[in-house]
């Protein structure tokens, strides 16, 4: 049986990337929340 997670960098970046997060107000909210929490990685 084929596994469900077949990772690919490009689609991942396009849907959860930093630049995509910065596009919208809510996306920036996500980044700021993760900064406040002290996350090592802010976006995918």
Swiss-Prot record:
Organism: Campylobacter concisus (strain 13826)
GO biological process: translation
Disulfide bonds: none
Gene3D superfamilies: 1.10.287.3980
Gene Ontology CC terms, in alphabetical order: ribonucleoprotein complex; ribosome
Assigned protein family: Belongs to the bacterial ribosomal protein bL34 family.
Keyword Signal: no
GO molecular function, one term: structural constituent of ribosome
Keywords: Ribonucleoprotein, Ribosomal protein
Name the UniProt record assigns to this protein: Large ribosomal subunit protein bL34
């Amino acid at each position: 049986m084929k596994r469900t997670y077949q990772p690919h960098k490009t689609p991942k970046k396009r849907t959860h990337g930093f630049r995509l997060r910065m596009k919208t107000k809510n996306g920036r909210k996500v980044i700021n929340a993760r900064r406040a929490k002290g996350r090592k990685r802010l976006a995918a």
